[in-house]
């Protein structure tokens, strides 16, 4: 038979047990303690779970149920009302958000608040109404205030006045923007009248063909009037250029040549000639300064 050895060491007449036996005993004790703790926690949870059905604080209906604990706190159980589709916590405030609403939004940021000025027409109403009377009736039905109706009538009158003054606008109810004509004109078709744009014309002007006599009288008036025509001067022949009448308009005699830029020896002329050349140079200050510089260099 096999002999069972003692799991201990004998040293100097004393038995020293192995440490493995002690570790197994400690692990068994820890497991037992953990089991007792988990059992106690489960008992506490089952005891604190609300079994009583609480009425909804909003609609006072009893169709409520317990959902979960808020933030894993046993003192804040979260309930749900099936009637009004709202959540609330016992001891907290009620959330006014239905299921699937997602993130809460401000009332002012709702898309309907931006379009309060848009009026929606009633259903099953007339599809086409071209007369002004029908439009005024519809507007009076929509707006209960008489001041608004008066404003609409005034706008209609203004729109009619604008169309008579020449602005292209749609007839009927007043539009917020005037209708401008297209940039490119419409090409006329066969047997199709084309409306021409209003042109300011004098009352005496007549449409149609004009006689040639009127054109001749206009040409004679233009000839008799004081119209300056520039004269061309031929420079091929210096004698003809000297005899032309342009020199007289400038105040220079035809007999004497223009000596504005002459040398010092030729400048010594009579006083009359000096005054004439000085007048010409004074008329052109740039030429005067150039002539002075030229004389200084000489």
From Swiss-Prot:
It is found in: Nucleus. One of its GO terms (biological process) is chloroplast organization. Expressed in the vascular tissues of cotyledons, leaves and hypocotyls and in stomata. Not detected in roots. PROSITE patterns: ZF_DOF_1, ZF_DOF_2. Ubiquitinated. Residues 210-219 have a biased composition (Basic and acidic residues). Zn(2+) binds at residues 56, 59, 81, 84. Induction: Circadian-regulation at the protein level, but not at the mRNA level. Strongly decreased expression during the dark phase. Accumulates at high levels at the beginning of the day. Pfam families: Zn_ribbon_Dof (PF02701). One of its GO terms (cellular component) is nucleus. Keywords: DNA-binding, Flowering, Metal-binding, Nucleus, Transcription, Transcription regulation, Ubl conjugation, Zinc, Zinc-finger. It comes from the Eukaryota. A zinc finger (Dof-type) spans 54-108. Residues 27-46, 200-231 are annotated as: Disordered. GO terms for molecular function: DNA binding; DNA-binding transcription factor activity; DNA-binding transcription repressor activity, RNA polymerase II-specific; RNA polymerase II cis-regulatory region sequence-specific DNA binding; zinc ion binding. Transcription factor that binds specifically to a 5'-AA[AG]G-3' consensus core sequence. A flanking TGT sequence contributes to the specificity of binding. Regulates a photoperiodic flowering response. Transcriptional repressor of 'CONSTANS' expression. The DNA-binding ability is not modulated by 'GIGANTEA' but the stability of CDF1 is controlled by the proteasome-dependent pathway. Ubiquitinated by the SCF(ADO3) E3 ubiquitin ligase complex. Binds to the FT promoter in the morning. Interacts with ADO2 (via kelch repeats), ADO3 (via kelch repeats) and GI (via N-terminus). This is Cyclic dof factor 1. It comes from Arabidopsis thaliana (Mouse-ear cress). The gene is CDF1.
């Amino acid at each position: 038979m096999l002999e069972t050895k003692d799991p201990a060491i004998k040293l100097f007449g004393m038995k020293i047990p192995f440490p493995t036996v002690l570790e197994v005993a400690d692990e068994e004790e820890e497991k037992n303690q953990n089991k007792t703790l988990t059992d106690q926690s489960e008992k506490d949870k089952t005891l604190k779970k609300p079994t009583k059905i609480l009425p909804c604080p909003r609609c006072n209906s009893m169709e409520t149920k317990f959902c979960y604990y808020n933030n894993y706190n046993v003192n804040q159980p979260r309930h749900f009302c099936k009637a009004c589709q709202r959540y609330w916590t016992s001891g907290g405030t009620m959330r006014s958000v239905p299921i699937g609403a997602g993130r809460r939004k401000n009332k002012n940021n709702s898309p309907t608040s931006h379009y309060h000025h848009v009026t929606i027409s009633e259903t099953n109403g007339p599809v086409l109404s071209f007369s002004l009377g029908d439009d005024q009736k519809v507007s009076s039905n929509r707006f209960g205030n008489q001041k608004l109706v008066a404003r609409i009538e005034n706008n209609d009158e203004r729109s009619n006045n604008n169309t008579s003054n020449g602005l292209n606008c749609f007839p009927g109810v007043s539009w917020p923007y005037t209708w401008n004509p297209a940039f490119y004109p419409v090409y006329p078709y066969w047997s199709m009248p084309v409306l021409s744009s209003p042109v300011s014309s004098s009352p005496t002007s007549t449409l149609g063909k004009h006689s040639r006599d009127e054109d001749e009288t206009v040409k004679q008036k233009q000839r008799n009037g004081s119209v300056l025509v520039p004269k061309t001067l031929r420079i091929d022949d210096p004698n003809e250029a000297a005899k032309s009448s342009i020199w007289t308009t400038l105040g220079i005699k035809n007999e004497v040549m223009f000596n504005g830029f002459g040398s010092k020896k030729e400048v010594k002329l009579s006083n009359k000639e000096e005054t004439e050349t000085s007048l010409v140079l004074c008329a052109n200050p740039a030429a005067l300064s150039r002539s002075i510089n030229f004389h200084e260099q000489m």
